[in-house]
Curated annotation (Swiss-Prot):
It holds the Pfam family Ppnp. Its EC number is 2.4.2.1, 2.4.2.2. Belongs to the nucleoside phosphorylase PpnP family. It catalyses: a purine D-ribonucleoside + phosphate = a purine nucleobase + alpha-D-ribose 1-phosphate; adenosine + phosphate = alpha-D-ribose 1-phosphate + adenine; cytidine + phosphate = cytosine + alpha-D-ribose 1-phosphate; guanosine + phosphate = alpha-D-ribose 1-phosphate + guanine. This is Pyrimidine/purine nucleoside phosphorylase. Keywords: Glycosyltransferase, Transferase. One of its GO terms (cellular component) is cytosol. GO terms for molecular function: guanosine phosphorylase activity; purine-nucleoside phosphorylase activity; thymidine phosphorylase activity; uridine phosphorylase activity.
Length: 107
């Protein structure tokens, strides 16, 4: 999978979504067909996210380690790689060193 460098034809919510005392910051984008994504960055930390809808997390820069709910194994993902998170679940993410830039594809 190649790295998504830009998203065309979107409306961007200018106020950022700020989570975990600023360790994760994202902006919501909406396409003309009503679908949405978020584009963000996670600073070095270990965080736990909960999901409503299924998500595909696409790495744009940096790297992270991810552990899905109910699993004991951490998997590493970098730029150009993605991982899937089921809906109504959670995942732990660890970022060390450089910030991890991502696109979250919902649904």
């Amino acid at each position: 999978m190649g790295i998504t460098e830009k998203l065309d034809g979107v409306a961007v919510t200018t106020k950022a979504n700020v989570y975990f005392d600023g360790k994760c910051v994202s902006h919501s984008v909406r396409f003309a067909d009503g679908t949405g994504k978020s584009v963000g960055v996670i600073l070095p930390s270990i965080l736990t996210f909960n999901t409503g809808a299924p998500e595909v997390m696409e790495g744009v820069a940096g790297s992270c380690r991810v552990r899905l709910k109910g699993e004991t194994t951490w998997n590493t993902y970098g730029a150009g790689e993605s991982y899937q998170v089921p809906g109504n679940s959670s995942f732990d993410i660890e970022v060390v060193g450089e910030p991890y830039h991502y696109i979250c594809h919902f649904g």
